[in-house]
Structures are given as structure tokens and as C-alpha cells.
């Protein structure tokens, strides 16, 4: 049996962790094995890379940053994601290659096509079965982040124009692949968002079971 790969994407402060937890609870109640993971930081090596790319103070050259994310992705897919999918689990992942295209491609103003190709190479071509894009106005997301008072994060601390480029890049990716993406207004009540995600996930899993 082949598992199901679901990723959650969007800018910082959109509620990915909340929705991942809600979806996990529902899937486990339905009897599925669920593996919850993230990029960067979904493996022991990834935790070390996460500290560098997100929490290290000081400049990191944009191309170096992109390569660090790709290194994390290559190791994570090979050691965590593919083994879980091979045994039939549902993998719920906070961020994947679409984040690299949005943050390093648009945010850092690198070539988005090159970033995507690098990411696909690192992931051995693995694409999600479903990508949930939680979309939220940048100003509203900023309010949530400020209220959360989390530790220093290099990406969260970027200026508003950076985050707006990231948001528009995500929307562009979703528009280019509507069959893979579910775009949800992250300003909606969290239970409404969770219901929309469950509906799409349920249809995806049912289709896989009947294939």
C-alpha cells in the first residue's frame, strides 16, 4: 500500500501547526497511521540545519540558504517521508518545496524555476498528493506573529514587502497547479478551515483506497 503525502503551506502566522494537529486527530480517529513532520527540522540532521537557517543571527547568502534547505529536504525525504509512505502512512508535513520556491525564489529574489528544479532533485521528484495553502493578508499574519512572541526567526523578521512577495508566489503556485492545491482563507474560523481540509483529504484517501 502506498501512503498519502499532504503538505501545509503559507506564510508565517497562518495557522499551519493548528490545522496539522486538527487533521492528525481526525485521521487517527479514522484509523490511519499518521506521521507529522516539518521542513526544516524533520530529522536529527534537519534540526541542526533549522538552527542555522532560521535562528542564526547574521547574514546567510541567499544561494547558500537555498542549498541548506535542499540538503535538509534530501535527507528528510530519504529517511523520513519515503519510508512512511512506503508503509502506507499519511504524512502531514509543515512546509515542503513550495516554501523554497516562495521564500528563496520570490522572497530572496532568486530564480524560482532553478529553486524548484533544485528542490525536485533533492526530493527525487516526490510531489505531495495534496498541498493545503493557508492564505492570509500579510498585516493580519504580522499581528498573529507579534502576539505569539516566539524566538527570533530570520524569515519572520523580514520586512513586509518580503512577505508580500512570498504570499503572491504561493498564490501563483496554487494557480498553476489547482489539482494539487487547496487554497483556504486562513482568516476563517479554525473549525471551518479544518472541515474544508478534511473534506479534501477524505476524498483523496478514498480515491487512493479504491484505485
Curated annotation (Swiss-Prot):
Q: Which residues bind ATP?
A: 10-17
**Annotated Gene Ontology cellular component terms:** cytosol
Q: Mind telling me which Pfam families this protein's record contains? A: Thymidylate_kin
Stated EC number for the protein is 2.7.4.9
* Catalysed reaction, written as an equation: dTMP + ATP = dTDP + ADP
InterPro entries on file:
P-loop_NTPase (IPR027417), Thymidylate_kin-like_dom (IPR039430), Thymidylate_kinase (IPR018094)
Family, as annotated: Belongs to the thymidylate kinase family.
List the protein's name: Thymidylate kinase
Source organism (scientific name)? Clavibacter michiganensis subsp. michiganensis (strain NCPPB 382)
Taxonomic lineage: Bacteria, Bacillati, Actinomycetota, Actinomycetes, Micrococcales
Amino acid at each position: 500500500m502506498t501512503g498519502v503525502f499532504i503538505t501545509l503551506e503559507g506564510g508565517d502566522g497562518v495557522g499551519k501547526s493548528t490545522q496539522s494537529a486538527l487533521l492528525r486527530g481526525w485521521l487517527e480517529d479514522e484509523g490511519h497511521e499518521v506521521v507529522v513532520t516539518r521542513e526544516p527540522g524533520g530529522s536529527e540532521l534537519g534540526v541542526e540545519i533549522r538552527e542555522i537557517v532560521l535562528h542564526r543571527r547574521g547574514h546567510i547568502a541567499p544561494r547558500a540558504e537555498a542549498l541548506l534547505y535542499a540538503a535538509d529536504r534530501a535527507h528528510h525525504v530519504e529517511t523520513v517521508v519515503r519510508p512512511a509512505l512506503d508503509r502506507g502512512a499519511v504524512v502531514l508535513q509543515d512546509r515542503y518545496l513550495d516554501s523554497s520556491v516562495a521564500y528563496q525564489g520570490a522572497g530572496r529574489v532568486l530564480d524560482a524555476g532553478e529553486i524548484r528544479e533544485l528542490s525536485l532533485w533533492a526530493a527525487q521528484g516526490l510531489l505531495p498528493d495534496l498541498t493545503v495553502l493557508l492564505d492570509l493578508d500579510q498585516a493580519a499574519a504580522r499581528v498573529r506573529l507579534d502576539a505569539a512572541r516566539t524566538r527570533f526567526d530570520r524569515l519572520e523578521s523580514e520586512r513586509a514587502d518580503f512577505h508580500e512577495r512570498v504570499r503572491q508566489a504561493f498564490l501563483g503556485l496554487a494557480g498553476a497547479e489547482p489539482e494539487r492545491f487547496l487554497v483556504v482563507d486562513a482568516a476563517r474560523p479554525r473549525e471551518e478551515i479544518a472541515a474544508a481540509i478534511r473534506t479534501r483529504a477524505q476524498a483523496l484517501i478514498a480515491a487512493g483506497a479504491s484505485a
